[in-house]
From Swiss-Prot:
Annotated compartments: Cytoplasm
Modified residues (4-aspartylphosphate): D51
Domain of life: Bacteria
Protein known as: Transcriptional regulatory protein HprR
Length: 223
């Protein structure tokens, strides 16, 4: 899952990039507002983290221009903490507003909340013959209905929505169970095994791949 970070403070940019990368996200980071707007319009990002005070073009201008073309979720970062500034940010199209200084754990929680909310709006997912509906929690593959538990559904959605990415066990444990990963715990591996029994085993082409020492990945196949 790809996130765009537009932040001109080098130290903030580096530690946010490192933290989000360790959490399993792919990060593009730029420090100039014009470069940020160019990337935001050119590429399809799952989320944009946007500083307000930027060289080249400020965050307000970026938001206004972006909202004429896209509805990508945006979290604003700024040292400006007045009520008027927060209202302006939200009225300009920001989905959330985080005042500096902030803890990375809070930023990560807000990132995950925005991504969950955005996924909820996109209620269906279709890939490689797999069809999922997040409203009815129905799943089918090649028009064959599959019954999953709620956690299995969430796990499959996480993998399929990030097809082609390697998702570490730590990220899966945090996203699905809200727990810190313990190397002595096989919760994730057991859940993947049960999911494969329903989604992969009855079919000749396998969708869930193990990337040894790294995690799991959803393999898109041509239909």
């Amino acid at each position: 899952m790809k996130i765009l970070l537009i932040e001109d403070n080098q130290r903030t940019q580096e530690w946010v990039t490192q933290g989000l990368s360790e959490a399993g996200y792919v990060i593009d980071a730029v420090s100039d507002g014009r470069d940020g707007l160019y990337l935001a319009l050119k590429d399809d990002y799952a989320l944009i983290i946007l500083d307000i005070m930027l060289p080249g073009m400020d965050g307000w201008q970026i938001l206004q221009t972006l909202r004429t073309a896209k509805q990508t979720p945006v979290i604003c970062l700024t040292a400006r903490d007045s009520v008027d500034d927060r209202v302006r940010g939200l009225d300009s199209g920001a989905n959330d507003y985080l005042v500096k200084p902030f803890s990375f754990s809070e930023l990560l929680a807000r990132v995950r909340a925005q991504l969950r909310q955005h996924h909820a709006l996109n209620s269906t997912l279709e890939i490689s013959g797999l069809r999922m509906d997040s409203v009815s929690h129905s799943v089918s593959r090649d028009n064959i209905s599959i019954t999953l538990t709620r956690k299995e559904f969430q796990l499959l959605w996480l993998l399929a929505s990030r097809a082609g990415e390697i998702i570490p066990r730590t990220v899966i444990a945090s996203e699905i169970w809200g727990i810190n990963f313990d190397s002595d715990t096989n919760t994730v591996d057991v859940a993947i095994r049960r999911l494969r029994a329903k989604v992969d085993d009855p079919f000749p082409e396998k969708l869930i791949a193990t990337i040894r020492g790294m995690g799991y990945s959803f393999v898109a196949v041509k239909k």
